[in-house]
UniProtKB/Swiss-Prot annotation:
This is Carbamoyl phosphate synthase arginine-specific large chain. The lineage of its organism: Bacteria, Bacillati, Bacillota, Bacilli, Bacillales. Its EC number is 6.3.4.16, 6.3.5.5. The gene is carB. Pathway: Amino-acid biosynthesis; L-arginine biosynthesis; carbamoyl phosphate from bicarbonate: step 1/1. Pfam families: CPSase_L_D2, CPSase_L_D3.
Amino acid sequence: MPKDSSLQSILLIGSGRSSSAKAAEFDYSGTQACIAFKEEGYRVILVNNNPATIMTDDVHADAVYFEPLTVEAVEAIIAKETPDGLLATFGGQTGLNLAFQLHEAGVLKKYGVRLLGTPIEAIKRPRGGPRTFRALMHELGEPVPESEIVTSVEEAVAFAEQIGFPIIIRPAYTLGGTGGGIAENMEQFLALVEKGLNESPIHQCLIERSVAGFKEIEYEVMRDQSNTCITVCNMENVDPVGIHTGDSIVVAPSQTLTDEEYQMLRSSAVKIISALGIIGGCNIQFALDPNSKQYYLIEVNPRVSRSSALASKATGYPIAALPAKLAVGYTLAELVNPVTKTTYASFEPALDYVVVKFPRLPFDKFPHADRKLGTQMKATGEVMAIDRNMERAFQKAVQSLEGKNNGLLLPELSVKTNDELKQLLVDKDDRRFFAILELLRRGVAVEAIHKWTKIDRFFLCSFERLVALEKQAAAATLDTIEEQTFRFLKEKGCSDAFLAETWGVTELDVRNKRKELGIVPSYKMVDTCAAEFHSETDYYYSTYFGEDERKQPSGKEKVLIIGAGPIRIGQGIEFDYSSVHSVFALQKEGYETVMINNNPETVSTDFAVADRLYFEPLTLESVLDVIEAEQIKHVIVQFGGQTAINLVKGLEEAGVPLLGVTYDMIDQLEDRDRFYQLLEELDIPHVPGLVANNAEELAAKAAEIGYPVLLRPSYVIGGCGMFIVHSEAQLAALIEQGELTYPILIDAYLDGKEAEADIVTDGTDIVLPVIIEHVEKAGVHSGDSYAWLPAQTLTGEEKAKIIDYAGRIAKKLGFKGIMNIQYVIADGNVYVLEVNPRASRTVPIVSKTTGVPLAQIATKLLLGKSLVDIVDEKARGLAVMPYAVLKYPVFSTHKLPGVDPMVGPEMKSTGEGISIAATKEEAAYKAFYPYLQKKANANEVYVIGNIDAELEAEMTAKQLTIVADVPFSDWVKRDTALAVIDLGKEEGEANKRMTALSRQLLVFTERETLKLFLQALDVDHLDVQPIHGWLEKKKQAEQAVIA
């Protein structure tokens, strides 16, 4: 059928701010949906308050609203834009929840807006109405675990007594299993039910008989309005049911199912999507008894999901773009597969390789957090690897995680006893994969490990072969290794770095020997059809099996962009934004773009973005292999975060030409002695600081500087390993804990304002469009700070110094491209804290709110252009912004028991949000609005320690009740509880802060953040405005200044 001509405009709901369980996958799918709608001539209206996304670029939508994802805000947008249709399935659970709320509030009916794709009943049944959903499944003959929906602890207990333990608790309308878990006894059950009811936006939980230990199988299914259904991909979780699929190792296609089991579950998936009437994509999860053919349906996600992005990248099938086309009337048989350009979308993908996904968990940041995995997702991101055999796919996935180990050995586990390792498996610890390998090294039988983990023996035997590879490598040396053995080790995924470590030589030695023997990878194509048809895509993975399948290059000059790898705390979706914009700029300049990355969630790994895409680990070996295979002469590292920067030294030593930066330049900025020397040469003030190489030096030099001091390592991102130390005793305790790495930098801690700026430079001139001022004082990581664009309280003199110092640094270094500089303003001086010779996490928000495309300008400068050629001189100064932009952090620490929500120098946030308004107060209101709306009847704040009279008076004036004399354990359960205030940051009160967070209360440990919140309480309305409206006001203001 042709597209629906009754639609002229479509409102797309984004997924909002990134968090654990909600990362870049929704940016990828949402971007594809916007492009698909624009291709069909529809006017696209987008609401999404995540500034780091590609989808919120004005080229992808006709009107972009950075507004809260609430009924009130979206209704205002609908009234203003009058869309004909609304699509929520690309906004994750956030989008579905909001669509349901708009329907229930009568907003869609009032304005005549049609819900596209997933019908409202399909949204309600799997999540909001388990009774009706279960009835439908029984009608279809589809087995579901015995379950009951409850709205109170009492109802839950009554059902638990009927079915017995273990029991799974699933809160309704949440994402990533938030608030849920498996209870083995009544004590655990009561805690999880109470938490789950609190997390659910409709105060409901599904209480379900546990099928933990069964195989977990997923199907990505697609359906059109003619009821044509296909399965795009089926995936098997290595971990059995009981660990959230987002935290599990996943392989595609499934490896342990018989054909009968595969077809049985496929038929079930098709039957379910048809019965629900879903138009578009759907993720369906099953639990399969490993000892019989009994299965249960455990979850239906009637939307694009994290698994959808994985399935899309695993198969090459455009799983996001096609559902958008289906939603407006097309059928699968009418849509051509853009990969082959000859087959149709109704043709099911086929794989002639294996894909392995590993989760990226945050415990390197939070080693003291509860590392046990369950039904609530904790991962911040993931990596994907492709190869022709299971062992190499596993090894490539581990290499992509960027851990400190070159192979599969975790040193921290090698000192544990067998019983301790077994306990890690029983507890479902995040290190269980490495614990299994350690037990196998010690000769523990596969059968015993299977008994403890319920992981299929097929996978355990594959792990056993990985251990055998280690022994085989250790039995040789670089001089004695036979070609056949060497080739076998490479075929099975042993990295050059691992072999170098094993043989006591350098990685370059191994590489040279390997090339001398002609052992080099070939590159195979991801084509959706297992080479059955000709493919038009340049989407590749490396393997040591078979012939090279790469197409002939275009003849254009090539540039390689190194991506940022998996999303993690400190390095998120913002870096993908910069990478993609660099690709766009290069293509406009006539270059052939080559992207290397390993993150299946991102836009940068969409095969339609760069001219050639390589899905590979971001290791020196893999990057050099691609450079040599493609004969690349230009490499960009500035947009790949610390991942790419850490490769600079090795690439330079290998003779690779890097654009805009050298290792010496980076070292000059990271080595504190050299950095301070640079600043002194330029007459730029810096914070007093010293370097310590051991514990004795650290204690002496900290005393020399005087407390408080800030400790930080070099070459890190996200403030990893940073501490503020207030006393000699606190330092002694840190040294005793053994958590410090040397050499370590010791800076005097200045209690002042913090600011930062992103600049682009050609080595002579700079463009610095806006100064960002942090709300909190220095000492809170920039990624965890609320921040104003433009700066709100800096004087003209302070701004002039910030710009002047940036210009001096850029010119002295001869730096080209983009950099981020951080400052502290204290005692009447402007100090330079640090310079990052790369794109920062603030590039997207600066680019979008000023209209200055920093990443694209920087790319052109890297190619040799000057600012004079690109940016008009009048546009090089600070932007005139007649509006207030507030960047605010998003934390997922409530999903990580044991993590204190107190902010400090080490970054903890997993994402960011944006609010734009005419005044600071309204911008603050928009930032806190979803919380204030949820806690509309709450007015009590619990104070730990003391607060000053000024704050007390202000809170009283805002009609907040201050509580300090009620037992905390009683108060925190009240419906009137709003926030906990602990400005003294009492060390002994961490449990109260964590408990408050688990109850979804605000926790304030910084006076400035609390003041911002109080400002927000003065506002009671929302004014919605698209970004182009704000930029038009900016243009008018700048013209008025010129006039």
